[in-house]
Design a protein with these regions (language model features):
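Conserved donor nucleotide-binding strand/loop of the catalytic core
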Residues: 22, 36-64
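Hydrophobic/aromatic residues located in beta-strands of well-ordered beta-sheets
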Residues: 23-26, 149
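A generic local structural motif
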Residues: 10-14, 32, 56-59
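Acidic helix N-cap motif at the loop->helix transition within catalytic regions
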Residues: 9-11, 33-42, 82-83
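Short, well-formed alpha-helical segments that are part of the catalytic scaffolds
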Residues: 1-20
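A conserved acidic beta->alpha catalytic loop
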Residues: 16, 20, 28-37, 51, ...
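Catalytic-site signature of metal-activated, phosphate-bearing donor transferases
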Residues: 56-62, 69-73, 80-243
Length: 243
């Protein structure tokens, strides 16, 4: 786990896995809220870093893990009781798959989302020696060095969008980091990317992927994704101009 001012859901997140974890490895990127005291309450000594890069920090956490099986968890995620039971069962087995794909149950302002790109699965549980971390600052993920994986049915509960202020702050950070990543790769922005991509993002999530079925309470979320696209490519355009 990587933390940085993550006190809002950190206690619930760690509590959800403490009974199945032989060790909990946390890299903290300079928290100034209650994060460190919460970690201390679980007798967790985080690895301190000044680097605010999710991919590199998660790679550091993975390198410090010693168990055969690793679960990658974010501080706004809570492992469901049914997934806990599944993991306990897996740990008792002698023959394991190299990786396990886990479904996510995403929430916006406390309400469950079922459509519009919010009903997906991710690799989060794997043999330690069979995975590495995608080294990017945004949307980092586990990468399995094998084709031997299994889909699980029990979910991780994800509370990424808790308030509008928190959500738009996260999207702003993501967009600026993503623009930097794209700039480093030599990508050029364009009028089409700045104008059309945000509109397409909004339409794809709300209409094409049937986000409207969740109810129009999710409208600020889909507008937020459009905003993130706009900010990414407009920031990239500014970086291109400064060359």
């Amino acid at each position: 786990m990587v933390t940085r001012n993550a006190d809002e859901l950190l206690f619930q997140s760690i509590k959800s896995v403490k009974d199945i974890a032989d060790e909990i490895v946390v890299v903290d990127a300079g928290s100034t809220d209650r994060t460190l005291s919460i970690l201390k309450s679980f007798n967790i000594n985080p690895i301190a870093t000044r680097l605010n890069h999710l991919g590199k920090n998660k790679s550091k956490a993975l390198s410090r893990a010693t168990g055969d099986l690793v679960l990658a968890l974010d501080s706004d995620e809570i492992v469901s009781p049914s997934l806990i039971r599944t993991i306990k069962s897996l740990k008792r087995r002698k023959i394991l798959a190299d990786g396990y794909i886990i479904p996510f149950r995403n929430h916006f302002l406390g309400r469950r989302l079922r459509y519009g790109g919010e009903n997906y699965r991710m690799l989060r549980l794997a043999k330690r020696r069979k995975v590495n971390i995608k080294n990017v600052s945004v949307h980092e993920s586990l990468v399995l060095n094998s084709k031997h994986f299994v889909n699980l049915g029990s979910p991780i509960m994800h509370y990424s969008y808790r308030t509008l202020h928190q959500m738009y702050g996260k999207f702003t950070t993501y967009a600026l980091n993503e623009a930097t990543e794209r700039y480093k790769k030599g990508e050029q922005s364009s009028f089409k990317k700045v104008t059309f991509y945000p509109v397409h993002m909004f339409w794809a999530r709300l209409i094409q992927d049937k986000g409207y079925k969740d109810g129009f309470f999710r409208l600020p979320l889909d507008l937020g994704f459009a905003y993130m696209e706009f900010l990414t490519y407009s920031s990239l355009a500014i970086k291109n101009l400064k060359k």
